[in-house]
Amino acid sequence: EFFPLQVASYNIPDLTKHRKILLTSLQANKQIAKSLPLVMPLKDSYTTTNRYQTLFDPFIEQNLPHRGIDLVPTENDTIFAPGGGMVSEIREHRGFGLTLKLEHTEHIRTFYAHLQKTLVTTGSQVKRGMPIAIVGNSGRSPGKTLHYEIRYDGNAINPEHYILYPIKMD
């Protein structure tokens, strides 16, 4: 049996090679497929300013692991749920500003930071494509940006390796 998050450990050529297996697995379990964060959280045009890598943090002048991707919207500032789940936490964080966490499955969570405001409350159930927040400039961010992470059992994985469907959610 192929578990969908095994895809996170593959490099890009392997990801392409195993995409068919993953899609077959998801078709066999449509409930899991509805929950997994398989699309980007921004619907319209955006620029990716930082990727999942080691980055220099100008605020503390050190290289640090960047465990997500930073997206700057060029049109719509609304953040949409990339998969179904429950809002498990909304809170202020010193570095990340206003943050939101979605619990998609027992093992999979997504994290959103630097928000202007949330459009949901803790405990809310969301479906893929529902508006959940507005991109902002809270915390230590260089401007209006969304910091987005996918976590499996608490460990960050590269969100760009996990997207299966087209970026736009028309």
Language model features with spans:
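Non-catalytic extracellular/periplasmic "stalk"
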Residues: 1-47, 51
